[in-house]
Each structure stands twice: as C-alpha cells, then as structure tokens.
Amino acid sequence: MRRPVPHATALGAVFVVLLTVPAQAAPFPWAPPPVNMCGETGFDPLYREPDPAAPPAPVAAPTIDIPIPVPQLIPVPMPDPPPDNTRVAQAPLPSDPCRNPCPDVRDSPGPAAETVASAQGSTGSASAVPRIQIRPEYEPMPFPVPGGEGEPPQAAPVPVKPPVDPGPLGAAVAPPGLESVRLVEQVTGHGSRNRTDMRWQVDGTDLGLFWETEPGRVAMVFGDTFGAGWVYGGAGADTADWRSNTLAYSTDRVLDDGIDIEAMVQDSPCHAAELLGSRKIKNWETTTIPTSGFALGDRQFLSYMSVNHWSKVPGMWLTNYGGLAYSDDGGQTWTKDQHARWENLFGVGRFQVAAMVPHGEYVYMFGTPNGRIGVIGLARVRADDVLNKTAYQYWVDGNWVPAAEYSATPLVHGIASELSVRFDAESGRWQMVYLDPAVGQIVLRTAAEPQGRWTETVPLVSTQDYPRAYGGFIHPWSTARDLYFTVSAWDSYNVYLMHARLDPR
C-alpha cells in the first residue's frame, strides 16, 4: 500500500507487502548494484548489508508528525470522459541498445546525474529533541457535477440462467519440490536491460502481468507507472507522468538471461500510453489496476479493479468494482465493458481482484476481495459468454452454481493476495502463485483441477530476503520444471524476473 505522505500524490501501485523485514533476518553480504550494458546503474532488491566503504548515514532528529485533516470539496464531471485513444506506432529500436530512440524526449543522463539508492537522513547533527511537524492532510470529498457526453451506452447482454452443475474436487497431487530460486534480472526502470526509462518514459512501475496474445508473442501489463520526476522510495507523485497502467510486448523465449521488451503501446513517440483511464481522484476513483490478461481468438481481455482509495492500513484498499475490458486491435486501445462488473457492495465483494484463465470451453475466474486479507473464490463461464455476468457459475460446496458470487467456497485455507494462475498442458497441472501476507512469502500451489484439491504451499520468495516484495505473476511459457515469474519491490518500485527450478512429483 502507498504510505501516507505529506503532499498530494498519485497513491499509485497497489501492492506493497504487509510485512517488513523481520528483525532476525540476516542481510546478504554487500555487493555493488547491477550495471547494464550501457553502464547505467540499476537496482538490487535483495536485502544486503550496507556498503562498508560508504560513510555512516547522518542521524536525523526524531520527528513527531501531526496531520490535521482538512476536507477538500472536489467536483467530478459526470459521466466519465471518453478515453484518449491517440496511438503512435512503435518504431524499431536502435541496433545500438545504448542509443536512445528519442533524444528529443529524454537523452541519457551524464555520469553526474546517475543516482543510486541510498539511505537518506538529515544533514545536520543529531539531536535528542524531536522536531514537531504539523501539516494539513487534505481529504478529498468528491461530488458529481454535469459534464460532457461521455461514452455511449452499451447494449446489455441477454440474461441467461445456467444450471447447477457438479464440480467435484480433483485427485490430490503432490506439491513439486523446489530445487532453486534465483533473481534473473531487473526488467523495468533505470539500469535495466530494457532501458524503459529512456525508451518509453517508464522510470517506475510494478506488476508485470503476462498473457500470450498470439502464438509466439506475450503481452506484459504494468500497474501505476511513472516517468520523469519519479524518485526512489516507492510509487511516484501524481505530477511524475502518472499513468494507471501500461502495456509491453515480447517475443523473447530465452528467459534464463532475462526478458526483452520489444515494444510498448504508445500515445506519442517514446511514451507508453495509459490503457484504461481513471479519474485519479481519491475517494472516487484513484486508479484502475489490471489484475490479469487473456486472449480469446483475436480479442484481448483484461480484468481490472477500480480503486476507490488506498487505506492507511498496510495491505488494505477499497475498490469500486472489479471489471473486464477488451481490445480488438491487439491491445492498442481498450473498451471497458459497462456490464461485466462485480460491484463491491459494502466492501465485501468476493471477486474484486481477479485472475482469469481460459481452458477448454470455459474461462475460469479466481478472485479475492479488495485488500489482502481475503480468501480465494472461483467461478467459470463459457468462453462465448465471458462478458455476460449472468452466465457465470460459482464454485460452491462441490457444485457450479449461478448467481452465487458471495457464497463461493474458499479454495484453500488462509488468505491470499493478487493471484496468478496458469494451466501447464505438459503436466496437466494447474499452477497458482500469490503473496501470502500472513507468512511474508510468495508461494506456489498446484492442483489437477481449478477447484482443487490444491497442494500445500511451496515457498518461492521470502520478504525477509526481498523486503516488501509482492506479485508473483507467471510467464505463460513456463513449464512444470521451470517457473518464471515477476516480482515487484516497493522501494525501487520496479519489476524483476525470477526463475524457480522445480522437481515435479
């Protein structure tokens, strides 16, 4: 979650882990930060000892922060404005990876401009006398006012009444053994091989959700994204070229050395476009965050959540609804479906953060409530009816039941956060990865059927080793033995590729 700050910010990027590094966690030995092929310094998300050659950080006087709530009336023109679908085709990247494609937009920083993450503190001498800071904390109070015409209404799908079908548990399977897990490389941001800051004005972003858009090509969608003005320490300010989401493409099949991003959806040269617009108004709609993607034929789909506001309680947020959007031009422009929405009545909606997976005749929807203290529910719908909410069947006590989204039986014991689910055709097993905030681990479960029986968890990444890591989004070209997935790290606010070597059983 975004931490409270003393100025108006985007409050972007959902997913900061609930747990900080435990006091007993031993740091790894210091190592110099990674450097890409252009000599640009990147980020190391691993918990390490400080640089022994660095001078000790100055000690700052303690501060007592006293926020004073100040209501702020915010008029919100309604209905929502139509999306800006301005798009610019991606030009081929330069053959020299260190040459920027748009030096007029942003050129490479000189050596003096290079920045490396470091501890920050006061430059004055230490003092035992605390500094008292009283500051206004503006709390938006949005109210609707008449606006423009907005989007034309969409025809509602014809309501259907699917039957109650049996959905017995599958056979129990053994969890895979874990041979190793390693950090492959930094995918986004300054110092990455993809140089997304120079090529697409993506300095800070998170998530990195994958799906295969067509044979041989994957899409990679990111959450709240920031450009010029972003600084190390979490998500950026609302003035730092904030976009609620962005989309990249890759055909790179050799993942053991990283993933190459070849193009992004652009609204101007070298500038990644926002796909799903948001009002960017706290307590109305702060942002729209993709939660999964999939393709049915030539149509691309995104599940997403409309975030009302981030809570001051770590790991909590309130959504307006979870919804579906689709694209018929390969992901360049998107339409939010006005009817395929799961409203968050009284904050107890079960399918606010959804991971959707086509398999056979159905699309399966794994869902959790807003925040990260909820349980996992499951639904399915025939692929032809994916935009018809009345056609969904929810898994309840061993049956597929229509109109039962609030009654869905939990798939596993315990809480989960931001799911990623994949069916591995070679092994015939389902793979599910998510952050378990109760133990501070990104974990893997497997099953023979989407409704389970799901195995016990296999720990993949610990937040003791990768402080405030979150995510765990599976690359679709993973296998039963080689699981590639992305994680995000809050402080460096960028995406990293991980590789787990598994021993299927």
Regions found by a protein language model. Name each.
Residues D206-G208, T286-T291, N344-A355, A416-S420, ...:
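Repeated scaffold domains used in trafficking and secretory/extracellular systems
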Residues A174-D197, Q266-R279, D329-G347, K389-V412, ...:
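Blade-edge beta-strand/turn elements of extracellular beta-propeller
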Residues W211, R217-V231, I289-G315, V353-G371, ...:
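Hydrophobic core segments of beta-strands in well-ordered, beta-rich domains
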Residues P27, R199-W200, Q451-S478:
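Conserved blade-ending motifs and adjacent loop-strand segments that build the rim/top face
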Residues G472-R505:
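Blade-level signature of beta-propeller repeat domains, shared across WD40, Kelch, NHL, RCC1
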